[in-house]
From Swiss-Prot:
Gene3D superfamilies: Ribosomal protein l15e (3.40.1120.10)
One of the record's GO cellular component terms: cytosolic large ribosomal subunit
Cytoplasm keyword on record: no
Name of protein: Large ribosomal subunit protein eL15
Originating organism: Methanoregula boonei (strain DSM 21154 / JCM 14090 / 6A8)
Lineage start: Archaea, Methanobacteriati, Methanobacteriota, Stenosarchaea group, Methanomicrobia
Gene that specifies this protein: rpl15e
NCBIfam families, A to Z: PRK04243.1
Region of interest (Disordered), ranges: 156-196
Entry's family note: Belongs to the eukaryotic ribosomal protein eL15 family.
């Protein structure tokens, strides 16, 4: 059976360090580092991943590249009244993933659009890069699309901020059901915050 073009793209991105993607990222990173934290782009870098997550090349859909710092939370150092061992700075981590932070920043930059999904496109020593798919639910071409018309419903407003995207649901423990996930429902804050 003949493989499609998307299959070859998917295989190349499955192991970026072992394929031609490594050389591409080397060149692209030098340009991406000089860009802003949220940059709108003409077309997705990973077309296979974007289409799998709902992207379509039509009006009302935009793709932005977002970079977020790598590592734990950058909490400021206490000024007084603690020994350094009691500051708790070595393992201070945020309660959400870096991908989720990227989605929220894209949502804030484009308040008239909703985050559909996002995917990883690269990282260097300091930053992680994600591409976020944004949809304008009020655009006529979106409202007439049977796969995307649901985003026009006001119920889905602020999806990224409420953890309703794929990355958000993963961070809230909603990917699995049943045994071992009793504390994550009805929400991650229920059961005295024992879900995380």
């Amino acid at each position: 059976m003949v493989k499609s073009m998307y299959a070859y793209v998917r295989e190349a991105w499955a192991r970026p360090d072992k394929s031609d993607v490594k050389a591409l990222l080397w060149d692209r990173m030098q340009v991406w580092r000089r860009e802003g934290s949220v940059t709108r782009i003409d077309r997705p870098t990973r077309i296979d991943r974007a289409r799998a997550l709902g992207y379509k090349a039509k009006q009302g859909i935009a793709v932005v590249r977002v970079h977020v710092r790598r590592g734990g939370r950058r909490a400021s150092r206490y000024v007084r009244a603690r020994r350094s061992a009691r500051m708790g700075k070595n393992s201070s981590t945020p309660g959400k993933s870096i991908q989720r932070i990227a989605e929220e920043r894209a949502s804030v930059r484009y308040p008239n659009m909703e985050v559909l999904n996002s995917y990883w496109v690269g990282q260097d020593g300091k930053l992680k890069y994600y591409e976020v798919i944004l949809v304008d639910g009020h655009h006529p071409s979106i409202q007439s699309d049977k796969n995307l018309a649901w985003l026009a419903n006001p119920t889905h407003r602020g999806r990224a901020e409420r953890g309703k995207t794929s990355a958000g649901r993963k961070g809230r423990g909603m990917r699995t059901r049943g045994r071992g996930t009793e504390k994550t429902r009805p929400s991650i804050r229920s059961h005295a915050n024992q879900g995380k």
